[in-house]
Amino acid sequence: MKREVIHAPGVPAPLAHYCQGVVAGDTIYAAGQIASDYRTSVPAEARVDPAFPYYGSEIQRQTRYILENIRKTFQAAGADLADVVKAQVFLTDLADFFHFDQVWKEFFPSPPPRTTVQISGLLVPGCRVEIDLVGVRRHVKREVIRADGVPAPLAHYCQGVIVGDTIYAAGQIASDYRTGVPAEARVDPAFPYYGSDIQRQTRYILENIRRTFRAAGADLADVVKAQVFLTDLTDFFHFDQVWKEFFPSPPPRTTVQVSGLLVPGCRVEIDLIGVGRHVKREVIRADGVPAPLAHYCQGVVAGDTIYAAGQIASNYRTGVPAEARVDPAFPYYGSDIERQTRYILENVRKTFQAAGADLADVVKAQVFLTDLRDFFYFDQVWKEFFPSPPPRTTVQVSGLLVPGCRVEIDLVAVRG
């Protein structure tokens, strides 16, 4: 499939090793953007004048700055923000959300599906939000999904969109948007030892997302990519038991801990991508890649698109293996983050090669670091594996599923 790197005039050039965006076929994958010009940190037009602190909103200025830049990126690809079909929003403080959403409405009169979580840090101090968008060219047919029985969101987004053969669903949490977490998604406080909040919430969410997929002429068996945002990783094992009920043949999955979700009491947000039932897909089984302990697969090929599971530096036998960590007897002779990044990318490369592709075919990358101070050293290894880098989103999260792991990498590729 034909790929083209986007070079949009007027958009700040990144300091790190990634590109503004890639067009693969008719799909536009944009890099996550923050409100920085990469010269002066947060530029004057994206912040409130400290001499007049009550005459403006930082989050609104930053959101507007970002969306104006992303619009230029999409326009350079022959599209516009009206062509966005999936959005992910990473806020450093959920108290900013309401004011963020007011600006979102200005740019998206007909909004795309969206996932919003709170993360613990962004790469430029003072930045309050990172926005990650996927779109399509203007001529591509799309249809908004309206599923009966699924709670209508309070905020400005839709349940999902069908774009050609792909189904993009909004991230869902266990809320009816009337009472917070509804009774059926929580344990009765009078009987606290007779149930599991995370299992009830997971079941509530997946039943709703199943309705969304069925309204699109598909089902959960047609999911080809999952991202799971937990507020507490100690919930993971019990979450995964419910996941097995809904996904006998599981999709690739990325799981990270975030620091907050938009409704108090919600413990998990689930973000899914699917394809139409007629689309040929194949589960990837790559030799030499550690078999996961949990219920997901290494990756799926759907049409020409390859969705890989998020990977961390674990062999799932000994935690972080020796080759992915510095010998504690020689702590100053190596870098944990560089070793972990190399370990992960070598494994992901095997996954892509088993699917008839390579890292040169990656069109979208998301990087979840547990400590942003690792970023510079991470990026040095990234350059080795990606001489011509894909668009990338990088955020700091609160935790990963194996203690000692410092980064999770989530990649999507398109076969050439």
Question: Over which residues does each language-model region extend?
Answer:
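N-terminal presequence-like segments and the immediate start of the first folded domain
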Residues: 1-68, 72-85, 90-207, 211-225, ...
